Structure formats: structure tokens, C-alpha cells
Amino acid sequence: MKKKNIKNSMNNHTPMIKQYLSLKSQYPDMLLFYQMGDFYELFYEDAERISELLKITLTKKGYSNHKIIPMAGVPCHKSEYYLSKLVKLGESIAICDQQKETDCKKKLISRKVVRIITPGTVTDEVLLEENEDNFIAAIWKENNQFGYSVLDLSLGFFGVSKIFSSCDLLSEIERTNPKEILYPENFSDVFLIESRKCIRKRSLLEFDLETSYKLLNLQFNTCSLDGFGIEKNNFVIRAAGCLLQYVKSMNMTVLPNIRQLKYNYMEDSIFMNFSTRKSLEITQNISGEKKNTLSAILNKTVTSMGSRMLNRWLNSPLKNFKIVRNRHESVEALQFFYKELQFILRQVNDLERIYSRLALRTASPHDFVRMRSTLEILPNLHLILKKIKSKHIKKIRLSIGYFEEVLCLLKKAISLKPSKCIRDGGVIAELYNIELDELRSIKINSKEYIKNFEQKEKKKLMIESFKIKFNKIIGYYIQISKRHTHLIPKYYVIIQTLKNTERYSVPLLKEYEEKVLNSEMRSLLLEKKLYAEIFNIIEPFLEKLQNSALALSELDVLVNLSERAISLNYTRPIMSEKYGISLLESRHPVVECFLKTPFIKNSVFLSRTQRMIIITGPNMGGKSTYMRQIALIVIMAGIGSFVPARYALIGSIDKIFTRIGSADDLSNGYSTFMMEMMEISNILHNATSNSLVLIDELGRGTSTNEGLSLAWSCSRYLININKSMTLLSTHFVELTKLEEKEKFVKNFHFSAIKSDLHIAFLYKIKNGISKKSYGISVASLSGLPDSVLEDAEKKLIEIENT
């Protein structure tokens, strides 16, 4: 049913549907979970949508306004399961709960939206991906430049960047991978983000500069944004202001866990565009999965905090050699302790996200239990860390801290096995509060009291079927078989008649019931009060807890890299401010882990006198693997990891560009060749003398002569204008003549051994040129008919002899 039809003739709807439509009109773009007793029900278009998304039954809720009401529902106690699925699909949900009866005659229960869930603003553990950041982003464009802001409410992280091109924006979106993106209604580059699951057009008013400026200063209790480095940066102020305003409105509260704003200086890390990240398969493979990626090999962290941090590092390798060398030194120092440390770190819970829920006051009793168990192991962690002679590890140890006061509080205040929610009671530990213990004892003793009362009355009345029972509707009651009703005293009041029994009440039992129920209510109210006080007591420690979580994350990453270095036989790289890359007997970090035979090691030397390496050889001969492994080793070195090589010297690298693999972009009408030329154009315009450039088979998408001409001219541009460190693979033998023309070029090749129509690859790079591409021999491996291969061989001989 269309929205306009639903809204028409409101007077013809039932009171309940009127209430639903009124609430739904406030959240038109969200699924409205409308509580009806023990179920959340959805109606009309929402019902049809959730039925399709979750494959649940679509039924009907009678008629209203003379039309069938489509309906679908989920049990309240299983709602988190369904909410998790919907959030992963990019859906947003408004949770509408029952409040109280407002009209005794009509019995229409008051309802209101108590919670809004969007993919980018969730903090609940069950709705989050354990090992992934959960960013929401906002974009503002002005004068062909962009302000880009990201916020992870589950971690308390808030960052901004100034971006100078749409290509760089795409790269930053790929790096941060936001679950939700906000953009202004006049945004002209929607095509950059339209393929993502959850994008939201926002009014220009939400990006207002003055309002954004005030909001940010109010959030951080400042009078200027100078301290964050963005006072005059209107682009990022607009983006950050819109983002902050949106998250506050969705969260229906202030954001005490957002304590600082980090300006992301793009020049601090090695730049990699979207194409580079995709072709190198750093955290996602070509299919969008995590397997067979650099992250899959390197990320054996034992905490979810560490896993998230390592992926952040992999997406932003550093140019700051001081930080990188500190990490290398730490990885080396940890090599004798990684087993002990990983054993302890496995017991560390997600303190980073628990901190955020503490600040937002949404932490569950189980969060407190997890925090308590984490704080309990810190002394043992310190004992090991004190043995390690490393300045950086000492700095991490001091940031981790001890938190004896918080631990003491949690041990005294929180039960060993509390209930899931505070509303269920049983969260506050015994002996923490005398009044609470007394109230609880009333209920505990009630069983004994009821048992004694039952035995006494049973004996007095001599009724064998006499029993005292309880249910939530009528409370305590006496149940007696109908054959004994003649023995009932006059002061017994009948309250219910069943087929074979009757139920009674007596004043004494009712008085005791009120006493028990009153004690339960008072007990629960007191528990809630004490629970809130625990948040107040912990609040002064929140900033140190956040710092401790970050330190534990970094320790986990460094310990993990130390284990990887030992287990995978990695070498500590030398980071040099000088120009060039020297790798001796290097290996591909991912490919070597999946081979059944030993990986063939290869070296590479790039310097001011050898800036470009042209590589020839057969398809499947190892050219692409070789080029990728060099880039991956540079990335590994840049995050503080040891690398797969016997010796590695990495110079100052500012950007990595790759043009490897081919694909059409049919949605924008671009052919494979056009995509190739656009990517090459981007490289030629943006690569510097400190950039690493990897190009696979440039010019293959057009005629041989034109392709060769383009490859020749682009190569000369890279040599003489960009002066970048370049590896270029080709099947154009004529391109290798550049070695004679340009003094900075060197030819290398991968060779193979051919027998009849069969081929064996050697995977070893050597000086010189491979004059054959062995295309027909490689084609034979695909299963082409022998007659086709023989015909192709004859034609090749004919062409070569012409």
C-alpha cells in the first residue's frame, strides 16, 4: 500500500493504526518496530520490506480504512537477532515500545520511539562486527575540494580530513569503509558513493558553517577549533558539524565518549588510491572477501581491539620513520615473550567498546563482568612487560595502567553471574548494600513462609488437595479440588472457578503477597539506583580507560607482528631516508603461505640510477606476483612489521600506484582500455620521484602499434618527468629498447622451459629480455582442443616468417 493511500482518510482507521501511522510519519525512511505485547510488529510497506529482507512470513492484521493491513512481526526476546541482520543489510530501525495505558475505556496503550538504530550509529555488542571499525561519514564539497569526517560511536573516535580530489575522496572512503554516509542535497558527485549500502541525503542547513562551528565547540567545551588544527578549515567544519548533529539526534543523547577531534594529515601516511588497494588485496580480495589477503596472513591478533587496529595500520602505512622504527624495535624486543603475552592477552575483552558504552551509560551488566575480568589480569601483564627492555614498550605499559579502585568496586558491586539486563535484577552483588540485602531476603524467605502457611492450613482444614500457587495475573492463590469445597471457611474468597478446582484468596495471603511484591519493586528500584551510581564512580576513570584500551590494542598488534616474524621467517627492514628500494631474496607474503612447494625468492634494486625495471616473460610466469610482493613488503615495513626477505632496505615512499588487472566499468560506460588510460593518467598526474609505480601490460587494450606507442610514451614520462620508482611488465619486446635510450631503465625477465606444447615456469627473475611470451603454451593449460593449439602454432610460425 502506498504512503499517500495510508495517510488518506485517517478518521477511517482504528485507534491503533492511527497511532502507528502518526509515529511512522516521524520516521518515514526507517523500519518502525511497533511493540504489540511480546512482539514487534511492522505494517504496510515496512511489513513487505522486512518480509522480503529476512524471509519471514507476511500476514495481515485485519482491515483498516476498508483495506487489508499487511503485517510481519518478530518476538521481542529475539529482536536483537533480527536487528543485527537488518543493520548488516544497511537498514535503519526505529524501536517503538509500549509505555502505559492512557485511556482506560479504549485500552489504547501509549507508545513512543525509545531508540533509533542506524548502521553507522550502533554501539550494542550484538549489532557490531567484532573485528571491524563501525564508521559513519559525512562529506562536504566546495570548489572541487572536500571536507570528510568520520565517527565511530562504538569507539569514541571522531576524525576529519581535507581532500583535494574526487579520486582521493574515493580512496579515503575505501580506507575508512563507512557503514553510513551523509551528503548534502546539492552534492554533485553522488556517483562516487551510490553503490554503497546506506547513503543519506541531508539538508544544507545541517551543514551550516556557523551552526557546525558552535556544535563542535560545545561538544569539546572550547571557544576555538585551533587546538584541533581546523579553525579556518571550513570544509571539514561543515562535514564534522553535520555528522555530530546527526549522531546526537539518532542517539537521542549527548556524546560524552567523543572527547577529541583528530585531524588526519593525509601526508602522514603512504597514499594508496582505490585501484591500488583493490589490486594489492590488503584487507579484501578481489571478490570482497577477507581470505587470501595480506590481513588474513598478518592478522593473528588475539583481541578484537588489536584486530581492528592492525587493519587500520594496514590501510595507512606510515611515512614517519621515527614511529615505524619504534614499532620495529618493539617487535624485535617482544620475540622472546610473545607466547606468554598472547596467553594473557587472550583474556582481554573489548575494553575499547566497553569504554564507549560506559561513557554513553548503555553498558550492560555483562560489560562490567568483562571489564572486571580484563582488569584482573593487568598485574600479570605488567610483570612480563617490565622484563622487556624497550622504551616504546615501557610507554605502552604505563598507558595500560592498573585501575585498582575500579577493580575493587566491580568485585564488590557486581554479581559473579549477573542477569543480562538491569531491569531483570540480580546484578548488584550481595553484601554491597544492606538495604538491598534485606529486601531480597523477603523474597528468599517467602518460599519458606508460603510452605509453612500451606502446611498449617492443610492440617487445620484437613483438605488433602490444598495447595498454594502463584501466577503473574492473580498473584498467590489457594487451589482446592471441588469435592472439598464444602470444607472451606467463610472468610475464603473465591476468585476463579475451573473445571475440577476452585481458586481462593484470604486476607493474610494477600497482605503477604503485597509485602513480597512491594519488596521486589523496591529491590529493583534500588538496584537501578546503585547501578547508576557505579557509572558515576567510574566516570573520572573513563579517559584513562580509553587510553588503556588503545595501549592494549597496540600491544596486541606488536606481539602479533613479533609472532608472525618468528613463525614466517621475516626480517627486520632498514628504513632509510634515502631514495630507493633494495630487497634481497624477497617473497610474496600471501602466495608463499598457500604453496605446497617452496616459494621462489627474488630480489629487486631500485635507485636513482635504476628507476625503472621493464619485465618480460610468459603469462603466469610470476610477473604480477613479483610486482605485488614489492608493494606489499613496502606496506608491511610501513606499519612496523618485519618482512619476507633476507635483507630489506626501504627508502622514503610517499605513494603507491598500481595498474594491475583489467575490468570494464559498464555502469559508467567505460571499456577496459578506457579504464586503463584513466588510471595511467591519474598516475602520471600524481606520482612523484618518491612514488612506487607498478604497471602490468600497459597498452594491451588497443591495437599492437597504438598500444606500444602509448606504453613507450607513458614510460618515458615516468622516467623523465615523474622520476618514480617503476616496475612495468610487458609483452611488447620493442618496449625493452628503452634500456638503450634511457639510462635509468633496466630490463629483466621471467623465463620458462617449453617442451612440445607444454611449458614449465621457473619463476626466477633474471637480467635481460624474454623474446617469447609462450602464449600458446600457456593457453594449452586452459584445456583448449589440441587441434586449435596446433593450428595456432602453425599460424605463429607463418607470421614470424613473414
Curated annotation (Swiss-Prot):
Q: Does the keyword DNA damage apply?
A: yes
Keyword vocabulary terms for this entry: ATP-binding, DNA damage, DNA repair, DNA-binding, Nucleotide-binding
* Pfam entry (one): MutS_I
Keyword Transmembrane present in the record's keywords: the answer is: no
User: Binding residues for ATP, per the UniProt record?
Assistant: G617, P618, N619, M620, G621, G622, K623, S624
Q: Which PROSITE patterns match?
A: DNA_MISMATCH_REPAIR_2 (PS00486)
The molecular function terms of the Gene Ontology recorded here are: ATP binding; ATP-dependent DNA damage sensor activity; damaged DNA binding; mismatched DNA binding
The Gene Ontology biological process annotation of the record reads: mismatch repair
Query: Under the cellular component aspect of Gene Ontology, which terms does the record hold?
Result: cytosol
Q: Which HAMAP family match?
A: MutS
The record's family statement is: Belongs to the DNA mismatch repair MutS family.
State what protein this is by name: DNA mismatch repair protein MutS
Species for this entry: Buchnera aphidicola subsp. Acyrthosiphon pisum (strain Tuc7)
